[in-house]
Amino acid sequence: HWTPRDVVELMADLVFMPIADKIKDASYSCYDGACGTGGMLTVAQDRLLTLAKRRGKEVAIHLFGQEINPETYAICTADMLLKGDGEEAEHIMYGSTLSDDQHASRQFDFMLSNPPYGKSWKTDAEKMGGKKEILDTRFNTYLEGGDAMPMIPRTSDGQLLFLLNNVAKMKKDTVLGSRIAEVHNG
């Protein structure tokens, strides 16, 4: 599926505008776990660089993504190679974010995504040992007492898992924390 450019720009505004005056001379990271051709990542990069420049700040933004479709993965990687020095392309991974998270140990400053909705994740569930056996802590929420509560949805639609994946990748001990903009079908 494809996200209209005006929607992507709105998402970037929602992520960056509330903290625009808090941007420091620093390096930031941006992630999309369903990156397709990488449009959200490049719009986010452009928006942050523009906001920083207007405020006299020197920033670097490093892009990270993962894509399961081989054609869109190839387009995204090629686009990153053409637009940059190749470093960004190294952070775009191929495979399923749900069952084979290639950025498992990372946390990000900003996350924008339009995950597939209405799409079965049954194959991913099977790769993770079956829906009832999934132990991946990304897909838990934690109750007030610290107890984990699995948030595993029906296998006919895995979009909630992409949101939980992003929440699990949020920075917890930084001044800005992390910010997420994600499109869902309602």
Model-derived features: positions:
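Flexible, active-site-adjacent loop/turn segments at secondary-structure boundaries
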Residues: 96, 115, 119, 137, ...
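Compositionally biased, intrinsically disordered/low-complexity regions enriched for serine, proline
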Residues: 1, 112-113, 147-150
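Short linear sequence motifs
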Residues: 110, 132-135, 155
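Conserved Class I SAM-dependent methyltransferase catalytic core
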Residues: 73, 77, 145-186
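A mobile, often basic/glycine-rich helix-loop segment
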Residues: 122-148
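Conserved S-adenosyl-L-methionine
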Residues: 3-113, 118-129, 184-186
